[in-house]
Each structure stands twice: as C-alpha cells, then as structure tokens.
Amino acid sequence: MIKSKSYFTLTKRSVKIFAIFTLLACGPGMADYDEFMSFFMPESSNATAQNQKYHYTPMMFYNDNEGEGQSFPNDTTDLTKLENLQAWTKYCEGKIAQKDLEKGIYGSIINSKLQSFFKSYNNQLAIDYLIFVQEAERIETALLNMESDSVKYKNPANDIKILTQLLVRAKHDFLKERIAFQLVKTFSKAKKYKEAVTAFNKNILQIKDKSFISDWALMRKAESEIALGDTAEAYYDFSRVFERSQSHRNQADLIARYRILTFPKEAIKFCKNNHEKASLYAFAGIKPGIDGLPMVEKMVELDPQNQMIELIMAREINKNEKFYYDQMYAEFNDDETKKTVKLEQERATDYWSKLKEFSIKCANNQALPKTGFWQTASAYMEYVQGDYAKSVEFLNQAKAIKTTNEGLKNQILLQNFLLISKKSVSITPEVEAEFLPILASFSNPKNFRMSNAVLESCKILSAKYRGVSGVQKTESKGGWFSSCSNKKADTKILANAPHAIAKAYLLTMLTTYQNNSSQEYGNFESQKDMFLIEDTTSLATIEKVIAYFSEANKSKFDKGLQKLVGFDNDHLYTLMGRRAMNEADYFKAAEAFEKVSPSVWKSDEWKYFDEDPLYIPTKYNRDKKNLNYNPYTFAKKMAELEAKLKANPNDAQSAYLLACGTYNTTYEGNSWILRRHSWSSGEVNSYSKGKYDTDYFQTDKAKTFFIQASKSSNQELTAKAFFGAALCERDAYQVFLLQQEANPDETQEVFLARMEKVRANKYSEYFKILHSKYQDTKYQKQVLLECGDYSLFMGEK
C-alpha cells in the first residue's frame, strides 16, 4: 500500500521527493543577511563609501567580512599595513625600494637591505625598534596559533624597560611616536591601565607632527579608560579614532558598541570645538538602541556640513520602518510578542511626525548641503502618512536638484513607483504607461528595498486590477488568486482595465524570486515563491492569463508586462493542465497538456512521473512502473473514464480506475506532480497554518469515486474500492492529526489517546466495512498481509 507518513526517517521515496522539492522549489540564498520591510534606501544620503558601512541594520554588529563600505564589498586591503608602509616610505624619504622596505618591516630587519639602509645613515634606533617589534609580533602570533610551547612568553616588565630606554634615545617624532605607542600598548596588555593612560598623556600628546600611530595609541588609552571606569572620556577618545583613523575606526565603533551600551553625555565636555561635538553625536548616532534624532538635531546645529548628518537621518528612517511595518514572518510571533510589536508600531506611527517635521525643516535650511536628500526624505514620510499630494510636491523638488548620487536617483525612482500604484484611483492606460518603465528598471532588483518596492507596488496595483479597494496586510492562505471574486469588484477599475485578472496575476508573478531575481544577486526575503502561488491559483484565472497572452491587439504595456514575466506556451499550458487536474476537470487538463511540447515531458521534473497513476498497491514499495502515460495521455484517459461513467453510472470498473487516478494526484498519491510543483513530508503541520481543507489533502473526490465503484456486484472489485476509500480516510486523518497540538495540561500519551478516539469514531468507516463484510475476499486477505495500517486496525479488533 501507499506508505504511512514518516516525518523523521527518509525512505527511498522521501529521498526522491526531497530531491524534487530542492530542485523545483528552492531558489538561491538570500542576498542580504539583515533584510527587513523598508523602502527608504540609505544610499540616498551623501555618506562616503567608507561611512556607508554604518547604515542601519537590525543586527547588533555589522558583517566585518564585507569590507569597510558597501560600495567595495570585495575590498580586502590591509589598511593598517598600507598606512604603515606609506609612513615609513615618507620617513625614509623614498630612498629605498618599496619591496625592500616591506621585507624589512614585515619580514625580518636582520640582514635586510632596510637594515643596511639605516646603518648607512647611522640610525641604530630604527633597527633596534624594528627588532623589538618583530620579536613581539613573532611571539604574539605563536601564542595565537597555540604554539606557546615553542616560544618564550614576553616579560611585560622587561619590555617596558626596553621601550622606556628606546624612548629616551628617540629624537625624531616619527620613531618617538611609534615607541610611545608600543609603550602604551604594553602597559594596556599588562593590565596596567593607569600607567597606559599616563604614558599616552606624557609621550603622545607632546608630539607635534602626529600621524595615524597616535590614534592607534589613543585606542589603547580608551580601552584602558573603560577598564578604569572612565567611560565618558573613553567614548570621546573612541569618537576621535572613529573620525580620523582609516584602519581602526571600525574597531573603535565595535568596542564602544559592545562595552558602552548607552551614550555618556558627560563625554561632550572633552570636545574642543563644535566639529568634535558633532562628531561625538555622530559616533553615538550609529549605535543600536540610541535615539538618533536628538543627535542629528545637534549635528545640524553645530556642524551643518558634517557628512554623517544625512546618514544618521537615514538610519532613523530605516529604524522607524523596522518597527512601523509588518515584518516578514510576523505570523509566527507569540501573543506576547504581538503585543510588543503593536506598541512599537504605535510609537513608530507617532515618531514619523517628529522625523518629518525635522526633515522639512532641514529641506529649508540653507546651511545644509543642497543634495536633494531632505526633499526626498520628506516626500517619503508624507507618503507613509498618506498625503500623496505633498509627497509628489516634495519629490518634484528633489528631482529639480541636480545630483550625481545614484542611490538618491534610485530612491526618487522607487518613491515614484510606490506613488503611482498608491495614488491611482483607477487603472487607466496612462497609469500603465507610467508604471511599466519603472517596473522594468526594477527587474532583478539589486537590493532588498527595491525588491520590497516591487512587492508593494505590484501588490497594490494587482488588488486594484481585481477591483479590491483595500490591500490586505497578508494574503489569504489559499493564494492571491484562489478566489478572485471573493470581494465586491469596483466596476470603474475593471471597466478601464481589459484583461484585469490576467494582469493582476502577472504582476504577482513579478514578486517571486523565480521571475525577478538573478544568479548575481540571489533572491530576497520579501519575494514570494512562484510555485506556491501557481499551486493555489484557480483554473479560471489561468484561462484568463492564456487569453491575455493570445490577445492579437496588444498595447505597449501588454507586451512589456508579458515580456518581463517571460512565460511561454509550454509553461502556461502545463500550468493550466495542472490546475485543471486539481479541479478534476480532466477534459480541460487533456486539452491543455496536448498543447505542451512533448519534449517537456522528458525533462528532469517529469522523470518523477514514473509510477502507474491508475494503480494503488496494497504494500509500500510495490508500485508499478509507469510505462504507458505522459501527463497528456493520462489526462485523456481520465477524461475518457469520466465520460464512460457519466454515460453509465453503474460502470464500476471505470469508477474504480477514475478513483485510483484521482487519488494518485493527491498529497499521498504517486502522481502528485500532476497538481503541484513540489512535495514535502513536513508540508502538513500545526504551526504554518496552511490551507489543508482542499481536495489535494482531503481526497474527497477520490473517495466519492471509490464509493461509487463499491456498488459493483463483483466482490473483489468492491473490496478494492472500500480499501481505496479507507486510504482516503486514513490520509484525511493524517492531515487532521498533524495539525493538532496537545493541550497545555495533556501528556503526550493522553493526547495520542484522544486522537485515537477521533480516528476510531470518524476516520475508520471503510476499514470497518472491509473487515466486517469482505473478509472472505482474496483482496482483503492480501491487504491484511501487506498493509501495515490495516493490520494495525485488525489488531485493535
């Protein structure tokens, strides 16, 4: 018989099905690891490529493997080494070859050309300094690589003595700065934090011509200050490193992010001027959990030309989006989380007004750079709050400002995209003409916000095509097009939009990763699964889509939309055949499958249509090979059987074969692929709230045919029919069981006993009939020997 559902073991069949599911249903991995529902691109700010790393993310830390800026994700430049070599080149006045310099500094100074160079200038101090640093580096590397047995531990006291002596000999600021840095570092690593701070103040501050090395030393001072509890000064010092040090800015941010969770306001007293104050507020503004609006307000007041201002504002907009919009997978939240989310949404709704007020003020502030950012941000927040006229007004102002910022250009385009779909009362050719070019430009979106915009705009316009006045926050579990007439249609919308349902469907297809992603960028979390939508779409909808593709007089929009989706006749008619099979319209299924190229049935997907669709075995793994049918010939056979049964309702053999064929296209059948793209043993469960009351899962249609066949005068055929009906009951029970959960006060044993009562009372009628009335048939005896479920049932009796 067909196997009982196994959810924790992989049988031969489940391995095969898993392979199909992976092949057909899984797209490439998510392109962005921290996606959320957002439409405002932070790239629209004037932040430098280096600062773009600090765009808002829901995560606590950034992905350090992506490089310093999003514009250079593959940049693996060792900034520390680069800075250092440039400094040494300047110190040597360019009189030694770069490769010799690098070997002497990052290899070994002993017997190197760099050593000879320094000797020629009587610079023994430089040689001694490099010998010390290279030995320290060698030991540190060995310890990190767990090679401690092969090296001697450094003696901090001895190192401090050596560095102090070297410092006394230093006359040039270049070497003095480096030796002082090593001294501060050694004190800090030895946990002599007060001495580290003192060494910095005594030796680094007096250096007139400071380089990046002073900022490296400042990092060590700040770390020591944290250990001493001086968080305010440490925060200030980290902010200076963040602004000035190309190589250590990320480290400064991470340590402050991890060690100082709140902004110490006392840090402001260490700032020497307005620029430093603004930089301090910027450093605070990029931290999670910090209210950035007061920070950016201060920055505008103190230093309106600061390049972090727009970035901080973009962060606040993105942060508020995170709380304002329903985020992906919100349906899995528990009740307590839902309450928290609701409160956050209420706060975010109020916060939009504050952000918008500040943004509009900045749009009119002549002291700020005229980039178009503030007009664009104001337009977006007017859109969020539903004032589309004002949004258009601000967006037009933004368009009038010349910019070379591609991120800002894309944001303006994105907002225009949203506005077209949202503000349009009805669908007209003019609306379609305006919508299409932007839709085409967002094809294969390059970031998740573009993907979100495609989803939102297509969803809104799709709803209007269907005559739905409002857009639901979540789709029905039956799919967007499983019932296109479940709401009262707006005749004005439909009257102005020929092929409205077909257009709505195709727009939905553009929200899927199969149709709107690429190998380069992968798919996004907001994108839908085309196969799941197709598997829940009505036959009537697909017929409308085919009629739309067959239209002779196509508009530019029609041609463009159909080209973007890219469906050919094979795809459309295969889908129509599947949906007809799902609705047991075998004549239309045959009609559709006949129009599919025979080569399609030879593709990898259809190699799994390899078991006889008109045969139901009594024992698992006793399936017959499919030697006679492809989808077209099988659908044709089913249509013929149905016609014979209609002509003669007493034709039990036709009823039985029709029942077998119908059963095999259900969830537990061997030919489910004639209805669905994919199959999973975990598809039915209690947590995803799927739509399981369909014939695909409940097998009602097959059971009806089996019962009709059971009226045969042939006892063996009748026994077969009742066994088939019993399988339908069993499958329905499995679906019911897998949706249930134990009550809080129930043990697993009590829960299973309760479920067993349900099975016995509601889902075992036909096993009972087979046992009580047909136990003398050969077929019943065969079933008793071979069918595990029936044997269990008999054991209970």
Regions found by a protein language model. Give the residues of each.
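Bacterial N-terminal signal peptides
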Residues: S14-A25
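Extracytoplasmic/secretory-pathway proteins
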Residues: C26-K185, A190-K797
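N-terminal secretory signal peptides that target proteins for export/translocation
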Residues: M1-T11
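Generic alpha-helix initiation/capping and coil-helix boundary signal
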Residues: K12-V15, N714
